[in-house]
């Protein structure tokens, strides 16, 4: 398993980590199996989504903001980031991606994203673990 550090520069962002994951499975020598990619934070998640059109990311983040507005007077959490926790629970903390013949099994337009919902932050982290078999 390898842990990667990432800095985020926006309150909400989706950072394409596909090539980091692809490189890691090659380094681990996984030919056929799967890889688990997991965020190590309660306010940042991992998702697989389109990586060809940047408007998809913009729309994705905007729609999450519509569902989970940042300022909600009824929220009790003292840090004021309840929306970030809800977004992370919706997206999920991890993804499992198949590996075939040494490469990720992703569709033409798919990429793996680290989703920041409480940034900007320094030293965010995610773990990558490949499993042969």
What residue ranges belong to the model's regions?
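Active-site histidine-anchored catalytic micro-motif
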Residues: 1-133
């Amino acid at each position: 398993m390898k842990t990667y550090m990432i800095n985020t520069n926006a309150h909400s962002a989706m950072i394409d980590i596909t090539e980091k994951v692809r490189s890691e499975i090659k380094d681990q020598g996984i030919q056929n199996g799967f890889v688990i990619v997991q965020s190590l934070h309660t306010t940042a998640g991992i998702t697989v989504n389109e990586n060809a059109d940047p408007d998809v990311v913009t729309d994705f983040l905007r729609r999450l903001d519509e569902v989970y507005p940042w300022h909600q007077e009824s929220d009790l959490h003292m840090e004021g980031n309840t929306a970030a926790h809800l977004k992370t629970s919706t997206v999920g903390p991890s993804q499992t991606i198949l590996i075939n013949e040494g490469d990720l099994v992703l569709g033409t337009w798919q990429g793996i994203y680290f989703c920041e919902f409480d940034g900007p932050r320094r030293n965010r982290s995610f773990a990558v673990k490949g499993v042969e078999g």
